[in-house]
């Protein structure tokens, strides 16, 4: 915990998020990228990649 700074990059003076936010939990809760799916560690919501 406490490493949310790793989920952002600065490009051309703008901040860009690397991961998606969870649609259930809302902004501030990132989803983990597991290669074949996106998963929320807080609520368990999963989106499969095609």
UniProtKB/Swiss-Prot annotation:
Co-factor requirement: Zn(2+)
Molecular function GO terms recorded: structural constituent of ribosome; zinc ion binding
Residues involved in Zn(2+) binding: 22, 25, 40, 43
UniProt keyword Lipoprotein present: no
Annotated cofactor note: Binds 1 zinc ion per subunit.
GO CC terms in record: ribonucleoprotein complex; ribosome
Keyword flag Secreted: no
GO biological process: translation
SMART domains on file: Ribosomal_S27
InterPro entries: Ribosomal_eS31, Ribosomal_eS31_arc, Ribosomal_zn-bd
Entry keywords, A to Z: Metal-binding, Ribonucleoprotein, Ribosomal protein, Zinc, Zinc-finger
Zinc fingers (C4-type), renumbered ranges: 22-43
Family: Belongs to the eukaryotic ribosomal protein eS31 family.
Subunit structure, interactors included: Part of the 30S ribosomal subunit.
Protein name per its UniProtKB record: Small ribosomal subunit protein eS31
Organism (species): Pyrococcus horikoshii (strain ATCC 700860 / DSM 12428 / JCM 9974 / NBRC 100139 / OT-3)
């Amino acid at each position: 915990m406490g490493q949310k700074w790793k989920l952002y990059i600065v490009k051309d003076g703008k901040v860009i998020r690397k991961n998606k936010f969870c649609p259930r939990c809302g902004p501030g809760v990132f989803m983990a990228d597991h290669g074949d799916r996106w998963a929320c560690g807080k609520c368990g919501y999963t989106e499969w990649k095609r």
